[in-house]
Amino acid sequence: MDQDGITELINKSEITSVVDSYFRALDEKNFDAQHFASIFTPQAKVTRPNGASLIGPEEISASHEKSFTRFEGSQHFVAGHHISLDGSTANVRANLIAMHMWQGSKTDANKLDNFFMAGGVIHATLVQSDGQWRISQMSNAVLWRAGGFRDMMQTGTATKKA
């Protein structure tokens, strides 16, 4: 493999790591704005499944923190990262399965609505600046849902509709 091929593999590995770091932060409830600034560009846009848009690392982290207080825990599985590179810009398509357990759900394991799952496709654009890849735009197209979806219509604050 030549140097260009090696550089491409390194970039794709770094891009995958950034995308995975975002979902890991959600699962670990690490909503520190400084941490989100290492994942997102200053004007990054995250479009939620309901069409609401969040702009910038601070708004993204604050909105997720507010939204995720409803959950006892969550787990996001991101796989099949397909990455197209064009210089310092990358486009990513990946599959996502997310499971969320409602607060208090551990108190009654027999309840059928103590969790919900959703599966879909994420699309993201990342840009490389000063040797670091960061997400500049991300959206999640939900393809299916299962479980107790009762409270998910309200997904936190947002500044704009997409």
What are these regions (language model features)?
Residues 148-162:
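Extended, polar beta-sheet/loop recognition surfaces of beta-rich domains
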Residues 91-93, 117-152:
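Short beta-strand edge/turn micro-motifs at domain boundaries
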Residues 26, 40, 96-98, 139-142:
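Short beta-strand segments enriched in hydrophobic/aromatic residues
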Residues 32-102:
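A solvent-exposed, acidic/Ser-Thr-rich amphipathic alpha-helical stretch
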Residues 1-32, 38:
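Short, low-complexity N-terminal intrinsically disordered segments enriched in polar/charged residues
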Residues 74, 115-117:
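Transmembrane beta-barrel outer-membrane domains
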Residues 104-112, 152-153:
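Short, surface-exposed loop/helix-turn segments at secondary-structure junctions
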Residues 18-22, 79, 121-125:
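Short, hydrophobic/aromatic alpha-helical segments in well-folded domains
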